[in-house]
Each structure stands twice: as structure tokens, then as C-alpha cells.
């Protein structure tokens, strides 16, 4: 067993079924912290240890994924953190907005979990 610390992912997903599934699958490979809204995700991400990835639902009550991404870019430890957006919004303007918000990937619902895991691994270099 390796002594290398596992990479840390902060997830913001307000749908309990999706957040549970993401936690179950991704925690096999990474340290996962699940939050259910944008404000909580930003609070967790802003405290040490900094996450290696933010996995954000775009449509959440209160602070949406785009707002979390914009706020994260203002924090010194999170300026260059990779972001993956999950969303039901599929229009071209939404994808462009996601990329402009700093997303490495923009995954639309419904998604295949294997595809998401592959994108996470690619983003985190493993």
C-alpha cells in the first residue's frame, strides 16, 4: 500500500441520489467530500487541505456551480484548481459558459458513471 496521500475531490451536488452515487464510486480512488450546495462546497474547499478537483452541479439552490467556480478563482489556493461541471443544461451557450467559468469538462445528465470516472482520472493525472 502506498503512503502517497489520495487526491481530494470536493463535490457539490444537491440531488441526494447523484451525490451518493458519486461518493460511492469516486471514494474507491480518491478522498471525497460531498456537499449539497455551493456555499458549503466553497467553505470546505477554502480550508486546508485544498482539494485537487471541484466537481460541481451547475444548478443548485443559492450559489450555483458557476458562482462557486468564480468565487474559487478568487481564493489563492484555488485559483488553478480543475473544475468539472455536471448539469442537465445542454445548450451550446451553457457549455460555453461552463468553459468560460474555468471547467475542464462539462458533463451533461444523464451521464455514464464510467465516462465521469475516466474524465476525473484524466483531469487528476491518473
What are these regions (language model features)?
Residues 16-34, 123:
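Two-component/phosphorelay signaling modules centered on CheY-like receiver
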Residues 34-53:
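Acidic, metal-coordinating helix/loop segments flanking the phosphotransfer/catalytic sites
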Residues 57, 87:
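Active-site residues of response regulator receiver
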Residues 60:
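Receiver (REC) domain active-site loop signature in two-component systems and cognate sites
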Residues 111-120:
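C-terminal output helix
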Amino acid at each position: 500500500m502506498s503512503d502517497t496521500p489520495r487526491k481530494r475531490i470536493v463535490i457539490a451536488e444537491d440531488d441526494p441520489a447523484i451525490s451518493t452515487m458519486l461518493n460511492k464510486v469516486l471514494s474507491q480512488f480518491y478522498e471525497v467530500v460531498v456537499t449539497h450546495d455551493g456555499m458549503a462546497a466553497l467553505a470546505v474547499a477554502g480550508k486546508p487541505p485544498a482539494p485537487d478537483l471541484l466537481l460541481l452541479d451547475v444548478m443548485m439552490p443559492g450559489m450555483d456551480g458557476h458562482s462557486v467556480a468564480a468565487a474559487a478563482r478568487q481564493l489563492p489556493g484555488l485559483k488553478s484548481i480543475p473544475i468539472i461541471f455536471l448539469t442537465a443544461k445542454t445548450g451550446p451557450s451553457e457549455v460555453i459558459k461552463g468553459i468560460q467559468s474555468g471547467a475542464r469538462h462539462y458533463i451533461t445528465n444523464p451521464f455514464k458513471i464510467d465516462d465521469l470516472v475516466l474524465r476525473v482520472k484524466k483531469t487528476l493525472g491518473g
